[in-house]
Amino acid sequence: MLDEGVWAEIKVAGEHLRLFSEHNAQGVQTSVYDVNAKKWIAPSEPVEDIEEGKEKATEYAKIYLQRANVELPPLVWKKARSV
């Protein structure tokens, strides 16, 4: 069950990622999902707090996009479960 969290979406140069930083029953976790490939590029990883989760998810996404020669765009974080 999700207690609180944030998410961001990246759509750039054919890439589509979703970044998450959430506090749930397992604690605070971060993850990054590749929507196009339908797979996790960074599965749930424990972090200290939501802010650290945002930083780690951003770093994972940046590294992933660099491999595709794409620059990380500015992120807009939204409250979890919002559209």
Language-model segments: residues:
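Mixed-charge, Lys/Arg-enriched low-complexity segments
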Residues: Y33-V83
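Short N-terminal "domain-start" leader segments
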Residues: M1-Q29, V83
